[in-house]
Curated annotation (Swiss-Prot):
One of its GO terms (cellular component) is cytoplasm. One of its GO terms (molecular function) is pyridoxal phosphate binding. It comes from Vibrio cholerae serotype O1 (strain ATCC 39315 / El Tor Inaba N16961). The modification N6-(pyridoxal phosphate)lysine is found at K36. Gene3D superfamilies: Alanine racemase. Pyridoxal 5'-phosphate (PLP)-binding protein, which is involved in PLP homeostasis. PANTHER family: PROLINE SYNTHETASE CO-TRANSCRIBED BACTERIAL HOMOLOG PROTEIN, PYRIDOXAL PHOSPHATE HOMEOSTASIS PROTEIN. Keywords: Pyridoxal phosphate. InterPro entries: Ala_racemase_N, PLP-binding_barrel, PyrdxlP_homeostasis. This is Pyridoxal phosphate homeostasis protein. HAMAP family: PLP_homeostasis.
Amino acid sequence: MRSIQQNIEHITAQIESAQQKCGRARSSVQLLAVSKTKPVEAILEATQAGQRYFGENYVQEGVDKIRYFAEHHPQLALEWHFIGPLQSNKTRLVAEHFDWVHTIDREKIALRLSEQRPVNMPPLQVLIQVNTSGEASKSGIEPQQLFTLAELISRLPNLTLRGLMSIPENVPDYPAQLAAFTQLAELQQQLAQKYPQIDTLSMGMSGDMQAAIEAGSTIVRIGTAIFGERDYSRNA
């Protein structure tokens, strides 16, 4: 059984290999360690392997961790990404603590995040979540509504629109994975023609990371392959 540090080294090597295979520059893909349900001790172990970017799905759990590391390990300067579904009654906590939000899919959430972002903090870096698979069970805006939401976000003073995020249909077939990710990449390229600051594609997890990187992902979200199986009773 590998340690968290060994897992990070293994995944980093996989990312570098995938980048090389498709002719992408080294370090063009960021590893986001998904630490939901994991204790601060596990996150601390990951930082000892050089990991600085962490993703959280649950607002209060994530805020508790951010506060802990700000108080006890401020020298680590960790970057925190909110990657879960976001309800309007939880936006203030996210706006006040996180560095990134990957899951904006409606105007109300964007407006509240900008309004509630403290003036002494830099703009919140945000991604629009797009439902490319059309699955009713998945969050995300429909592709045809994307450009209207992007226009709104671009005018909000305390948000910086950086790109797109998706969770495509879970399929084992590599060509199907690649096609789904390519669809999101093409939408991002269209947006970037109008908004030059757009440079981020958050897509790819353990089972489809290779296809995501080939399609242009800049952030892959990896959880159990780093930290092991999750204990959801912590959030019951």
